[in-house]
A protein has these predicted regions:
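C-terminal cap of metal-dependent C-N hydrolases
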Residues: 342-347, 353, 402-469
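Metal-associated gating/positioning segment near the N- to mid-region
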Residues: 45, 54-124, 141
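His/Asp/Glu-enriched, well-ordered alpha-helical/loop segment
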Residues: 210-240, 292, 296-299, 322-328, ...
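Short catalytic-loop micro-motif centered on adjacent basic/acidic residues
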Residues: 99-100, 130-133, 242-247
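Divalent metal-coordination and catalytic microenvironments
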Residues: 9, 27, 56, 67, ...
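N-terminal metal-binding scaffold of metallo-dependent hydrolase/deaminase domains
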Residues: 1-46
Length: 478
């Protein structure tokens, strides 16, 4: 086993920052020491196998992206990142664990969907990975399978109030699944949008000839998000199920979550970088360009981008500060323009939903520190510590302390990152919704369980290094 000393940096946690050296032995952190400590009677730097100089830099726990979709089947195609390409991109961006979504659809057995996801990921990942379980078909069989997931290390499942005919669950199905969630402690994750209402609005728009990507966001009105969020909260209240609402983008949905939390409910919410930075107005602007009005397809995701005029983006930042929202995940769901997004050229409903961001989450959220939206500590909390606690990984992940996995990022606040397909892009996509974003900060070194994956602008990872994470129940419940 080899030893590494990360020396001279500022160790940042969710609760504070301290000048300290971090000693790694094999895959674990074994000590957090006073800078230059000679507590053991000698200068550690001269006896360890490797020294990483972190002078002037932040030393943070590796990012945990708790919402990704590698190879997700959607709209007649598949998300374009494999577990291999997507986890390499994650590592480049300072994310050392992901939680992806195994898929079960109507008529399929949960166990089969899960086994398939294990096949896709095993031996292919560069960073550690866990799974949530999508229940796309709630029936007696899938309900019976839910409690058994806990022994498999899968302690959360997602249902959809959107996408009728695909992944959709009605209220009766949701109620039954939530009763099991309440009994077992499994976290219910919810895609909270009123799908039937959205589908009618979308059909009406298309009939009026409004077929461009921008109308995706018009059909998916914030009222549909607020209403579904409220309904999910009420069903969680009725059953006692812990509820985690994914990809929140409407300020009205945040207000629903805040009220429920004020009432003492175990209700949580995540947002994603796109809802902090991008807007419906930008998507409108992309209607008249070289793509013939279609460039807005790169912004098509659900929930959709919201109007900046209505102030949703500022409200999301505020909710992150006040803990009305607890986490930032990417909902990484990449599709290329060519042959994928293009499927919806004549009808926005056929555009596969999703944006690729796994590589940029740590940088984009650090930009919130630079602009004063969040503190340094909150950056770590939102991107690593809370994801670990929320999804049963805390202690081994999400923190720099003795005994934890040595998942560590050395982040240079004086570095710079220019995001662009030809610059810093390792995701398997032919475009980036983040093209042209400039970040004051840089992911310098990325370590996963003691192994350096990225340093000096070079990738040293090997596929298969990433291990499956058997998760415990949430450590975040009140
Ligand atoms: O646009 C999105 N979010 N695509 C992925 C599927 C989902 O609903 O998370
Ligand atoms: Zn969703
Ligand atoms: Zn998603």
């Amino acid at each position: 086993m080899s030893t590494t000393l990360i020396k001279g940096g500022t160790v940042v946690s969710a609760t504070g920052r301290v000048a300290a050296d971090v000693l790694v032995d094999g895959a674990r952190i074994v000590a957090v020491l006073e800078p230059g400590s000679t507590a053991l009677g000698h200068d550690l730097a001269s006896t360890v196998d490797a020294v990483i100089d972190a002078t002037g830099k932040y030393v943070i726990p590796g990012g945990i992206d708790a919402h990704t979709h590698m190879q997700l089947p959607f709209g007649g195609t598949f998300a374009s990142d494999t577990f291999e390409t997507g986890t390499a991109a994650a590592a480049w961006g300072g994310t050392t664990s992901i939680i992806d979504f195994a898929v079960q659809r109507t008529g399929e057995k949960v166990q089969d969907g899960l086994a398939h996801w294990h096949e896709l990921a095993a031996g292919n990942c560069h960073v550690d990975y866990g799974f949530h379980q999508i229940i796309g078909g709630v029936d007696e069989d899938s309900l019976a399978a839910l409690p058994k997931l806990i022994d498999e290390g899968i302690t959360s499942f997602k249902m959809f109030m959107a996408y009728p005919g695909v992944f959709y669950s009605d209220d009766a199905q949701i109620l039954k699944a939530m009763q099991i969630s309440a009994d077992t402690g499994l976290m219910t994750m919810m895609h909270a949008e009123n799908g039937p209402v959205i589908d009618v609005l979308a059909e009406q728009l298309v009939k009026q000839g409004k077929i461009e990507p921008y109308y995706h966001g018009i059909a998916r009105a914030w009222q549909a998000e607020e209403e579904a969020t409220h309904r999910a909260i009420m069903l969680s209240h009725l059953t006692g199920a812990p509820l985690y609402v994914v990809h929140v983008s409407a300020k009205q949905a945040v207000a629903q979550l805040a009220t429920a939390r004020d009432n003492g409910q175990n209700v949580f919410g995540e947002t994603c970088p796109q809802y902090l930075y991008m807007s419906l107005e930008e998507q409108l602007g992309a209607m008249s360009d070289e793509w013939g009005g279609f460039e807005g397809a790169k912004y098509v995701c659900s929930t959709p981008l919201r109007s900046r005029e209505e102030g949703h983006q500022d409200h999301m930042w505020q909710a992150l500060r006040t803990n009305d929202l607890q986490m930032v995940s990417t909902d990484h769901c990449p599709f290329c323009m060519k042959d994928q997004k293009e499927l919806g050229k004549g009808d926005f409903r056929a555009i596969p939903n999703g944006i690729g961001s796994i590589e940029h989450r740590m940088d984009l959220m650090y930009q919130g520190v630079v602009t004063g939206q969040i503190t340094l500590e909150r950056w770590v909390e939102l991107t690593s510590t809370t994801p670990a606690r929320m999804f049963g990984l805390y202690g081994t992940k999400g923190v720099i302390q003795p005994g934890a996995d040595a998942d560590i990022v050395v982040y240079d606040p004086n570095g710079h990152t220019s995001i662009g397909v030809d610059k810093t892009h390792h995701m398997n996509m032919d475009h980036s919704a983040w093209e042209g974003y400039e970040i004051d900060g840089h992911v310098d070194v990325v370590i996963s369980r003691g192994t350096v994956l990225v340093s000096d602008g070079e990738f040293h990872g090997t596929k298969g290094h990433g291990s499956f994470l058997k998760r415990g129940l949430s450590q975040y419940l009140i």
